[in-house]
């Protein structure tokens, strides 16, 4: 890339982990050019063949049985929260609505997402606190276990933390998280919005652990430079998302 003064840069930022195939990729150019001569947009109220194709690829190659598409990463994490809460509501347990997150994590810039992040820097000046979130210290298993209550619906954690410092959740820790969630009968949400889509060497950063989460929000690299997010989920938790419980224009 070149600045306005002609200075040359190697782009390792990649639009903050978005341009997974770089700039002006031939494959993306051909795909965009082909689609631009067809239907542009009809909303998710209709069947979209290319969207179905992507959903099938995602479910075929991941743990997921269902996919809900969004516009961005923060919408994907907000939708993940809705999926978790709605699941327990559909099971007659509406009191199980709290999401347990890591202090100083990052799950997006919308209102619920910033309070999920548990960071004063993120929430300062944005009015009344959004309820429904509890927090524990990264790597502190006693803090984690102590924070789980009969109102906890899910644990949501970045597989590799971004804003809070590049902290990798070890594979053994992911396995323990899965065991804890199974024992407490709560859901495991692994936020792969920034660390996913090949950035760790695998499609998802959690793959080497062999852990199967219940819900995974993704975005950034999946669009190759275009705004797209998605929530991946298993059949069990998807059962709560009936017609009309969620939607997205794009």
What residue ranges belong to the model's regions?
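Conserved N-terminal phosphate-binding loop of PLP-dependent enzymes in the Aspartate aminotransferase
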Residues: 1-250
